[in-house]
Amino acid sequence: MKASLLNKLDILQDRFEELTALLGDAEVISDQSRFRAYSREYAEVEPVIVAYRQLCKVQQDLEGAQALLKDSDPDMREMAEEEVAEAKAQLETLEANLQRMLLPKDPNDGRNVFLEIRAGTGGDEAAIFAGDLFRMYSRYAEKQGWRVEILSESEGEHGGYKEVISRVEGDNVYAKLKFESGAHRVQRVPETESQGRIHTSACTVAVLPEPDEQAAVEINPAELRIDTYRSSGAGGQHVNKTDSAIRITHLPTGIVVECQEERSQHKNRAKAMAWLAAKLQDRQDAAAHKEISETRKLLVGSGDRSERIRTYNFPQGRVTDHRVNLTLYSLNEVIGGAVEQVIEPLLQEYQADQLAALGD
């Protein structure tokens, strides 16, 4: 392992011991905010230190076994050769795991997200496909133990959605979904197509991390136009009695968000403001993403929403992710919610990209 990485591990070990002492300090325990922050950091560092200590132990075992290779007893030498081979294999695995653990962490990985799906080219077929994508992500979320709530929806005339905006809440949501942003294309024969011709339609998906605190994104109330209207969403007869739906326009950028799913105008406003904060944060981050992409071309994670990232070909039962040249013939499984079949290879490719940068 590189000296620079070993040095980083030594620094982390010192920090781990410091955190252990801090979490036992009465003054820290009485301050819940500090205690939670240190506890989170401890939970992040602990697995790295456990693996590092295991690596150090295996390194010592290897050195001991190598010393026995000089023994005059042939049986001892044979046993030592086996131990050396075993220790080297363990070291290789441990070093690879530690390198992954030391990869730069995306501060957004643990956050909830706003998932925006919009029908693009293809008319009714695009709207139907948007509905398919929303069901796909909803089923995947259910398997992950996440919660999905629709904030705003505009249904298509023949099913699906012209647009559907949802909030996905759970553990490491952004970490799993962040590479889903982009243009998704579908190729299939519409039910209304009498000649059996394959039509191509498209939808765009945007995955925005929810900021921890809206205070992190400065929003001047004077720059907002807030409109109320009667909801056409859930809520039964109640929605006909009050203007509970909220539409917020951020005048400097022209960004518009709306929420109509709650009966309470106050709740709709709070959710719309959180969504607006996420969109403004995303806008601020876009320039940084562009700079990174131009400096070093990334196969995965460029963040370009206009980029065609995936094709779903129904006649062939094929899903192709164009960023990593991945083709699977399990379309029904993927569209049925097994998106991990595509997500996991993308994450692996991204990690490989980071590891290559770590070695530069």
Curated annotation (Swiss-Prot):
GO CC term, one of those recorded: cytoplasm
Domain of life: Bacteria
SMART domains to which the protein is assigned, alphabetical: PCRF
PROSITE patterns: RF_PROK_I
Assigned keywords, A-Z: Cytoplasm, Methylation, Protein biosynthesis
One GO MF term attached to the UniProt entry: translation release factor activity, codon specific
Gene3D superfamilies in the cross-refs: 3.30.160.20, 3.30.70.1660, 6.10.140.1950
Keyword Protein biosynthesis annotated: yes
Cellular localization per UniProt: Cytoplasm
Post-translational modification as stated in the protein's UniProt record: Methylated by PrmC. Methylation increases the termination efficiency of RF1.
Role according to the record: Peptide chain release factor 1 directs the termination of translation in response to the peptide chain termination codons UAG and UAA.
NCBIfam families: prfA, PRK00591.1
The family this protein is said to belong to: Belongs to the prokaryotic/mitochondrial release factor family.
Protein name: Peptide chain release factor 1
Species of provenance: Stutzerimonas stutzeri (strain A1501)
